[in-house]
Every structure is written in C-alpha cells, then in structure tokens.
C-alpha cells in the first residue's frame, strides 16, 4: 500500500471515529426530552421518567462494555475492515431506529443495538490504525485518534 492510500485510510478511519462520537454526543442532550415525550405517550408513571432517562443513558455504554471484547476477538479472526463496516452499519441503524422510535421499547432497542455495534468501531479502528502505521508514526496517529474520539 502506498503512502497516499495509507493516508486516505487513516483519514477515513479518523472521520468515522469522529462521526460515531458526534452521533453519540448529539443525542445525549435531547434524550431526556425524547424519553419524556415517549413515556407520556405510553402513559407511563411520570415519577419513572427520570429512571428511564438514566437507564437509556447508561444502557448504551453498558452494552459497549459487554461486547467490546467480543468484537476484538472477531476482528482478530475475520479482519479489521469488515468489523468496522459492520459497526458503522449498526450505528446507522441505531440512529434510524432512535429517530423513528414511537415507544420507549423501540428507544431501548435502538440504544442496545447502538451499544453493541458501536463497541466495535473505536477499538477495532484503533487496532486497524496500529496495523497500518509504522512504529515511528503510531504515537502520532493514536493521538489523532484520541482527538477524533473526544472532539
């Protein structure tokens, strides 16, 4: 792989990381309003709305925690690129389901799917970046990965 091709892959991975984290971060401020609206539509007890907000906020990273090791093992077996693509497709599905949710149950399903699939994107992308960069440039590329994730 030549230098230009390698740089294009690095930029694409960094952009993917940025978009996934942007999608996660954009939803968080609207999640309480969205949850309240769906809870009231489902005629749920208003005292439980805050419980659902907390659970919907935490269920996403909880499923990321559960599945990150699974994705890591699968990426070692099947390769990095297919699992990054699968994770990004799952991320798109999660965002569509979240936007189209008409009940709290659908929102829970969307958040669980999001946690499962996005847990592949960050660690597998970092492993892929590590695979395609030289030891000399690896620290710099990993720093850029951190920037993409935290931006």
Predicted regions and their residues:
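Paired small-residue
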Residues: 94, 105-113
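Small-residue-rich segments within alpha-helical transmembrane domains of MFS-like 12-TM solute carriers
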Residues: 21, 25, 99, 115-123
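Conserved MFS/SLC helix-loop-helix module at the cytosolic interface between two early adjacent transmembrane helices
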Residues: 66-102
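MFS transmembrane alpha-helix packing/gate-lining sites
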Residues: 59-67, 117, 148
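Extracellular/periplasmic helix-loop-helix junction of adjacent transmembrane segments
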Residues: 34-65
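Pair of pore-lining "gating" transmembrane helices in MFS-fold secondary transporters
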Residues: 6-37
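Cytoplasmic helix-loop-helix junction between adjacent transmembrane helices
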Residues: 110-149
């Amino acid at each position: 792989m030549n230098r230009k091709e390698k740089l294009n892959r690095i930029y694409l991975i960094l952009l993917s990381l940025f978009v996934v984290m942007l999608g996660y971060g954009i939803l968080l401020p609207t999640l309480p309003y969205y949850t309240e609206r769906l809870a009231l539509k489902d005629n749920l007890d208003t005292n439980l709305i805050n419980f659902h907000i907390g659970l919907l906020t935490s269920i996403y990273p909880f499923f990321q925690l559960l599945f990150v090791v699974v994705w890591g093992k699968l990426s070692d077996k099947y390769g990095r690129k297919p699992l990054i693509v699968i994770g990004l497709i799952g991320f798109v599905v999660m965002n569509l389901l979240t936007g189209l949710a008409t009940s709290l149950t659908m929102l829970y399903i969307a958040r669980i799917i999001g946690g499962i699939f996005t847990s592949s994107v960050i660690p597998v992308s970092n492993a892929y970046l590590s695979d395609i960069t030289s030891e000399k440039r690896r620290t710099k590329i990993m720093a850029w990965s951190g920037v993409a994730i935290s931006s």
